[in-house]
């Protein structure tokens, strides 16, 4: 920087120049730490990926202890695999799942090699019975995400020619899903044979997640191909599922797709239901359809009312709202990340700290933890390298920039390397009390666990453009052309949609910088980011005659009540 030598300006110029050289020591330390941890996560990913490619590819997943493979996509639905072709080698699920992670790590060479191999070798014309939900989030989602990354010129991932090969594979797979939706209710079967459709005497039982978490992938497929059947089928199923909710706006865990009757009445944010909530919100962000927001808002309020107990979330009967099971499940650890997206930062932080406390207690997160007894569930002591806690840690750091979350990520990286890393990859933990290992490296370890830990320490990928991540961690870029109704204000880091009534102003959390009641724009302080659970009092002066005129608090998500002197507030203790 050159300065004009002028007596009156010399001092000011020196001050300006010095600002370019003064560095906050704590900030510098954080950046050094982030860089070091990023490289450690990179090493983790490639240790898992290279061993898969060496010992398991093109089969589905790696067995790291024996350095062999499992064709898990088919084995999920086939206890006996005699009917499979003798030359069946799986569907390269781990490769499909790894493509978006390779893109985020900037490995264009390996990304292009993977795309080329899949284009020339992958086929779904196989006599294999697969789980619709798992195949959708892992394979269909992986192909769609990789296709979108491949055609984005900013990524420069493909040096040769790319002619939508991954999209054609995704379209073929999507068409093979459609027979599953041919039920009296429109709710899809949980299992589908990729070659022959729904098998005779197929089970009619499925989960809420299984039929309510398909709309992101199938909706994106319709937008990309112009074929409306995929999104229509997924949306019809989702709406039917929502019509089956109780008067409390709660849904059970399992149901019958033919009769439309509930089988398991226990409702929760955990296994069997978790991604239902996630996809309602993310579908609203991705497609802008108001129905998604209305469903999510009602479901979210109900979850806060009937499941929340301090920082924990127990299960409750969908009809009565009374608690059923007081247990933490590892899949629930996604919830703080979802709360970040709707702006409930305080609640997200509170729950996240409790999950991490359990992680610290055992070294990893057990599958089920009994809250009332503070012990591990006797038959569910395993940890299959799940990503949900890493995912929420990433979101909370993005929202707060609190370096404590970097410490959490560092602790997780150390634990994974200490307890689960073996010469042949990363192994699941069979029993967290003994750290006995299991011979399985799930594909989601590369698709999600490593990805979210990497993004925690290096967010340059999400800083460039708006993405939502599917429940399997596959990024899909948010583009205005996919919105039914464009936001009134659109800009690169976020978007705002102004409305009338109780929802006077709201912002989706695409920039991951959302907190309740923080001004969107310093020039327009009346525009504020509200949490999803925030419902305004009917009167602007907060006066009331009854509880019906009071709303829901934005920070705690608690119902406000009318006091004896006629004002709405948080008068009742927890």
UniProtKB/Swiss-Prot annotation:
Topological relation to the membrane, as annotated: Single-pass type II membrane protein
Active site residues according to the UniProt entry: 134, 274, 367, 388
Subcellular location: Endoplasmic reticulum membrane
Molecular function as annotated in GO: alpha-mannosidase activity; calcium ion binding; mannosyl-oligosaccharide 1,2-alpha-mannosidase activity
TM annotation in the entry: 10-26
PANTHER family (alphabetical): ER DEGRADATION-ENHANCING ALPHA-MANNOSIDASE-LIKE PROTEIN 1, ER DEGRADATION-ENHANCING ALPHA-MANNOSIDASE-LIKE PROTEIN 2
Protein's name in the database: Alpha-mannosidase I MNS5
Source organism of the structure: Arabidopsis thaliana (Mouse-ear cress)
Gene from which the chain derives: MNS5
């Amino acid at each position: 920087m050159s300065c004009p030598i002028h007596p009156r300006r010399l001092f000011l110029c020196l001050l300006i120049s010095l600002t370019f050289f003064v560095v906050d020591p704590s900030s510098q330390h954080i950046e050094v730490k982030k860089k070091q941890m990023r490289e450690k996560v990179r090493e983790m990913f490639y240790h898992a990926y290279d061993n898969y490619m060496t010992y398991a590819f093109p089969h589905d997943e790696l067995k790291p202890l024996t350095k062999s493979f499992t064709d898990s996509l088919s084995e999920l639905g086939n206890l006996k695999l005699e009917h499979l072709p003798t030359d069946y080698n799986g569907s390269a699920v781990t490769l499909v799942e790894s493509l978006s992670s390779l893109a985020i790590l900037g490995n264009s060479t390996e990304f292009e090699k993977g795309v080329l191999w899949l284009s020339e070798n992958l086929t779904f014309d196989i006599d294999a019975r697969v789980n619709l939900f798992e195949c959708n989030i892992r394979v269909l989602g992986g192909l769609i995400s990789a296709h979108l990354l491949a055609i984005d010129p900013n990524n420069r991932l493909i040096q040769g020619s790319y002619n939508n090969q991954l999209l054609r594979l995704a379209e073929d797979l999507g068409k093979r899903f459609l027979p599953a939706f041919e039920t009296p209710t429109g709710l899809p079967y949980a299992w589908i044979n990729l070659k022959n459709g729904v098998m005779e005497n197929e089970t009619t039982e499925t989960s809420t997640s299984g039929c309510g978490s398909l709309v992101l992938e199938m909706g994106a497929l319709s937008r990309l191909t112009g074929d409306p059947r995929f999104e229509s089928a997924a949306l019809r199923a989702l709406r039917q599922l929502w019509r089956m909710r109780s008067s409390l706006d709660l849904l059970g865990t399992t149901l019958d797709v033919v009769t439309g009757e509930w089988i398991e009445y226990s409702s929760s944010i955990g296994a069997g239901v978790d991604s239902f909530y996630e996809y309602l919100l993310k579908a609203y962000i991705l497609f802008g359809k108001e129905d998604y927001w209305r469903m999510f808002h009602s479901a979210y309020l109900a979850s806060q009312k009937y499941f929340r107990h301090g920082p924990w979330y127990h299960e409750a009967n969908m009809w009565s709202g009374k608690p059923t099971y007081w247990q933490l499940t590892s899949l629930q650890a996604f919830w703080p990340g979802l709360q970040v997206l709707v702006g409930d930062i305080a609640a997200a932080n509170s729950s996240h700290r409790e999950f991490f406390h359990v992680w610290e207690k055992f070294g990893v997160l057990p599958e089920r933890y009994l809250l009332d007894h503070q012990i591990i569930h006797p038959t569910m002591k395993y940890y299959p390298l799940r990503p949900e806690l890493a995912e929420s840690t990433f979101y909370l750091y993005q929202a707060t920039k609190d370096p404590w979350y970097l410490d959490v990520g560092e602790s997780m990286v150390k634990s994974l390397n200490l307890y689960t890393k073996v010469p042949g990859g990363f192994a699941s933990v069979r029993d967290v009390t003994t750290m006995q290992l299991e011979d399985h490296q799930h594909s989601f370890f590369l698709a999600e666990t490593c990805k979210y830990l990497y993004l925690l320490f290096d967010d340059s990928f999400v800083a460039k453009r708006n993405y939502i991540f599917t429940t399997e961690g596959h990024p899909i870029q948010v583009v205005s052309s996919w919105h039914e109704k464009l936001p009134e204000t659109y800009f690169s880091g976020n978007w705002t949609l102004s409305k009338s009534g109780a929802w006077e102003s709201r912002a989706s959390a695409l920039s991951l910088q959302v907190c309740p009641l923080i001004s969107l724009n310093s020039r327009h302080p009346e525009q504020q980011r509200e949490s999803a659970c925030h419902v305004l009092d009917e009167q602007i002066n907060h006066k009331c005659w009854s509880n019906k005129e009071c709303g829901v608090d934005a920070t705690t998500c608690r119902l406000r009540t009318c006091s004896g002197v006629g004002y709405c507030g948080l008068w009742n203790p927890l």
